Amino acid sequence: MRVLVTGATSLLGGAVVERLVARGDDVSVFQRRSGPSGLSEHLGDVADRDAVDRAVHGATAVIHLAARVGVTGPWSEYEAANIVGTQNVVGAAQAFGVRRFVYVSSPSVAHHGASLVGAPAGPADPDRARGNYARSKAQGELIALDADSPDLAAVAIRPHLVWGPGDTQLIGRIVERARAGRLPTVGTGAALIDTTYVENAADALVAALDRAPEIGGRALVVTNGQPRPVREILNRIVLAAGLEPSRVRIPYRIAWGGGLIAERIWERRGSDRDPPMTSFLAEQLGTAHWFDQRETREVLRWSPAVTLADGFDRLAAWFSSIPPTAGDIT
């Protein structure tokens, strides 16, 4: 296949590209800044339709990872990248005869704030999704799946909490907060969460690309299928980075309410940095969110190759390999 990968400089995007190249696909990438891949590279912003058209032209398949991520920031930035950008990539795919389209979504598109215990992949709901990122990704998912047709097989994959060596998003933010003393246990820390090691997520996206003609129009959540208490996950990440876990505990209601206040203060200030706590972060740290993976594994004919234990061993080895001056991966 001639596959275009958008957002290829991200941790997950890079892992996807590696797999496609290794198996012999003709891969090109679309991203905002140049990377070291050595592949056919298109530079630009997904909000620029002309740039998107140039990138998509000639591709027979697209994996769309490019997105504005984060828990804070102006709606206009999320809208431009995650809604307008998706409209542009989907529109170009339709215009240039692309046959397979994988939209990389998030379980947050169907999360309304309550605990998720063995949950299925519920429908994306922009009206109830929590925060600008989730709302914009929900709208993007609807745009992508609405394009599914006999001519273009479109599927949405929702990897949950992707992490691995070199990660500047989930791992980077956790380590940054731990170093600053801003990583408390919210509630008891016993809520179960399920994460996804980056190589497993990449394998699932490639499987979705291969199965797209059979599963077009569907949304699937992808995880390691190994729920663990949130405190255990955080502690293992912090220990892998050579830091001591925090012993500070904050009741859930206090963390949630304080986070809501902090969000409003930071919004009024126009700060581009995350507040010490947000209501969404409190929900992520204080409520369960793990998913039934039976349908995903059956439909994709995929299963995780890297266990949590192996992933944490690799993470610790990576932290040990980087110079002390490079220890701040954010």
Residue ranges and their predicted role:
Residues A138, D151, W163-R173, A207-L220, ...:
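Glycine/proline-rich active-site loop of Rossmann-fold NAD(P)-dependent oxidoreductases
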Residues R211-P276, F312-A316, A326-I329:
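Mid/C-terminal beta-alpha module of Rossmann-like enzyme folds, strongest
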Residues V3-A22:
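N-terminal Rossmann NAD(P)H-binding glycine-rich loop of SDR-like oxidoreductase domains
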Residues A147-N200, A207, I237:
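NAD(P)-dependent short-chain dehydrogenase/reductase
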